[in-house]
Amino acid sequence: YEVTRTMARVAMGVQKAETVIKNARLVNVCTAEIQEGIDVAIAEGRIALVGDAAHCIGPETTVIDANGQYIAPGFMDGHIHVESSMISVGEYAKAVVPCGTTGIFMDPHEICNVCGKEGVRIMIEDAKRSPLKAMSNAPSCVPAVAGFEDTGAAIRADDIREMMTWDGIMGLGEMMSFPNVIGAEDNIHAELAETLKSDNIITGHFSIPDTGAALNAYIA
């Protein structure tokens, strides 16, 4: 929680930045313009100031001259199954980071269907070795709909409880088993409960045209 105090002090110049990038062209995605001569002050891995950062520079500050190069916020991919591309997170990063994607929210559903929780852990550990900021959801439906397909593993509520404690897990993966949600099936609702107990998010996946009672039951 002290990071907010640090950011304020750096922005005001009371505490000097660790790094300042000077003389950049900022792609301002809020105003849809290119702003010339912009500096960025950084401390504790966070941006403290965007603008004129001369007052943020101290004797120990690393100063990088962007020399008019463009800087922009990184793209965040809000939902992806990396393993569907038949590559690892590291190889995926090589393809997307140069194009501006710096973060992903991945749902390793497919590898979990084959390898179970260990497959999810492999994906998370692989992501830590890549330049991507990769956040993961715990796969919720393994198999996707019980009784309709065979899988190499099955995920139950106690597995969700465990995965919610893992570093890198941000929530519950897309809940594709909408028949079991609206039908109040025990294990599915236990998975939802374990996610809520851990104060994490639940992601949805409702794919039938019933926008009446069924949709309301799913959302509720």
Label each region the model flagged.
Residues Q69-Y92:
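Di-metal (Zn2+ and/or Mg2+/Mn2+) metal-binding site signature of metallo-dependent hydrolases
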Residues S88, S177, S207-D210:
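Short beta->alpha connector loops
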Residues H189-A220:
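Functional cores that coordinate and move charged inorganic groups
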Residues Y1-V20, R25-P73:
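Histidine-rich, glycine-flanked metal-binding segment
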Residues Y1-V10, Q15, G90-I201:
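Divalent-metal coordination cores built from histidine and acidic residues
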Residues A24, G45, G68, H79, ...:
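Divalent metal-coordination and catalytic microenvironments
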Residues G13, V20, A41, V97-C99, ...:
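Hydrophobic alpha-helical bundles that form the membrane domains of multi-pass transporters
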